[in-house]
């Protein structure tokens, strides 16, 4: 079973990693689209309501997405009907629960909408670990940037963050 809890060094998880776009949409999505086309990226996974909405609104449909349907701006994500399978999971802030991990395992195959009761932020790590080659994982940075991780190039470095997570026990 796989369950992780953020226990220390929260600052490392807030760092804006490799491809960080400090532009508003649609320009931020256009930058990622250019990257995807230039490097023959085959899979895009988004984590977060605003990022997912922007990708869908500006024509760059992710392979699978994870949202919690809560944003500071009260934004509703349109276009989620594109995803054929909906998986609902519980995932408290600072965690990647077993059920959330299992949902990401399924989502990397494509066509999955993960609806999170709690917080989806940490699921970006699960997507980075589990995504197939030629994938990008995109999420929003808390200061307003769009972060896109090309997993082939940065997976090993970013997975060192798991050293700052503790495995957790979940009640059945």
From Swiss-Prot:
InterPro entries: GTP-dep_dephospho-CoA_kin (IPR007164)
Recorded GO MF terms: GTP binding; kinase activity
Pathway this chain belongs to: Cofactor biosynthesis; coenzyme A biosynthesis
Keyword RNA-binding carried by entry: no
Protein keywords: Coenzyme A biosynthesis, GTP-binding, Kinase, Nucleotide-binding, Transferase
Keyword GTP-binding: yes
E.C. number: 2.7.1.237
One Gene Ontology term from the biological process aspect of the record: coenzyme A biosynthetic process
Binding locations of GTP: 49-51, 68, 70, 120
Reactions performed catalytically: 3'-dephospho-CoA + GTP = GDP + CoA + H(+)
Function: Catalyzes the GTP-dependent phosphorylation of the 3'-hydroxyl group of dephosphocoenzyme A to form coenzyme A (CoA).
HAMAP family: Dephospho_CoA_kinase_GTP_dep
Family recorded in the similarity comment: Belongs to the GTP-dependent DPCK family.
Protein name: GTP-dependent dephospho-CoA kinase
Protein's organism: Pyrobaculum arsenaticum (strain DSM 13514 / JCM 11321 / PZ6)
Lineage start: Archaea, Thermoproteota, Thermoprotei, Thermoproteales, Thermoproteaceae
